[in-house]
Amino acid sequence: LPGNTSRALWRKQLPFEAAPQLVSPASGWLVNANNAPWLATDATANLRRGAYSPLLGIEENVTNRALRSVALLSPMRRISSEALWRVKMDTGYDSAGGERRYIARVLALDTGGRPDLAQALRLLRSWDGTLDGRGAADALAFLLIKYPFRNIY
């Protein structure tokens, strides 16, 4: 959003009804995990980004928690308390998320003939995409994810 023109200046207050709102979607559920409102429920019921002006300043951030919650809840026709608890306690990283893409880029690095780096990448290749403390590569994956994504979480 360019800030060098008066186009972006507020001249009046936006009516409450004009703000993005998702009420009683057909899916029966909403997710709020500090994510953009375009990813709050099943894809068929989400708000459409193009329906809202970029001048509203709506953050576009999509967290792993939002991606995972939507991915896990979307196929459920009914959500039991046990299923909701499993979603809440999920330790996985969504394949569409930035963390998994970052790990994929790390795995593509040339180790430059360094056996220590080659060994670390072999271990990282075994990562199952979760941080449940069960996999041998969990700690390494956590350390790799933590630093570049520290400003998001």
Name the predicted role of every residue range:
Residues L1-Y153:
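Long, compositionally biased non-active-site segments enriched in small/hydrophobic residues and glycine
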